[in-house]
Swiss-Prot record:
SUPFAM superfamilies linked: Ribulose-phoshate binding barrel (SSF51366)
GO BP: any one term: 'de novo' UMP biosynthetic process
Recorded catalytic activity of this chain's protein: orotidine 5'-phosphate + H(+) = UMP + CO2
Entry binding sites for substrate: 12, 34, 61-70, 117, 178, 187, 207-208
UniProt protein name: Orotidine 5'-phosphate decarboxylase
């Protein structure tokens, strides 16, 4: 995998019209474009189709978490929109993950989100998950992969442990990545792009450091250079 192919650019904008100049600038420099909740809530499948026209696989980051039948139908609809990757919450349980995989079909890789990168140990304890985040992440990752998930979303702090737990097959997608010197924002567990890849990440998700850069394409090239 070329360094640029490891970069997933997050289209964190309220509309595709707002996202399009950024998306067109970075598409030649990255491997994947990500449509998240804000953009999908505004424009639905049209946002996925518009992003896909830029010639890159689209990662639809909806973090589905519902009863299995509902998630299966949502995954089927996501596949019809043209998404290449789709997220669900591993905490929804093994049957929900299996339902997502059934609904998505063979053309879409279902990625299971373990623990959000905005949560630290204190936040996890407050919702009943005592102990270090790594233990919860590894447990959820194993559950999801055993249920058929094609990949795992986890923070750079846990990616090495997840790789050791699930083996070489699943795609490991890592948000919470910030180039050296960049602000952490609302992320609690972060690392640089190079640190994440050295730890075992296949794909790094980059949002604000690209979106807020004066020249997003140059910023993407700089990140690829770090890898």
């Amino acid at each position: 995998m070329k360094p640029s192919e490891r970069i997933c650019a997050a289209l964190d904008f309220p509309t595709f019209a707002a996202a399009e100049p950024f998306a067109r600038a970075v598409a030649p420099e990255v491997g994947i474009l990500k449509v998240g909740l804000e953009l999908f809530a505004a424009e639905g499948p049209a946002a996925v189709r518009a992003a896909a026209r830029l010639g890159r696989p689209v990662f639809l980051d909806l973090k589905l978490h519902d009863i299995p039948n509902t998630v299966e139908g949502a995954a089927r609809s996501a596949a019809a929109s043209g998404a290449a990757l789709l997220t669900v919450h591993a905490a929804g349980g093994a049957e929900m993950v299996r339902a997502a995989v059934r609904g998505a079909g063979p053309g879409v890789r279902v990625l299971a989100v373990t623990v959000l990168t905005s949560l630290d140990a204190a936040a996890l304890e407050a919702i009943g998950l005592a102990g270090p985040p790594e233990a919860a992440v590894v447990r959820l990752a194993r559950l999801a992969v055993d249920a058929g998930a094609g990949g795992i979303v986890c923070s750079p702090h846990e990616v090495a442990a997840v790789r050791a737990a699930v083996g070489p097959g699943p795609l490991l997608v890592v948000p919470g990545v910030r180039p050296a010197g960049a602000a952490k924002g609302d992320q609690a567990r972060v690392a640089t792009p190079a640190e994440a890849v050295r730890a075992g990440a296949d794909v790094i998700v980059v949002g604000r450091p690209l979106r807020d850069a004066p020249d997003p394409a140059a910023a993407a090239r700089a990140i690829a250079g770090e890898l």
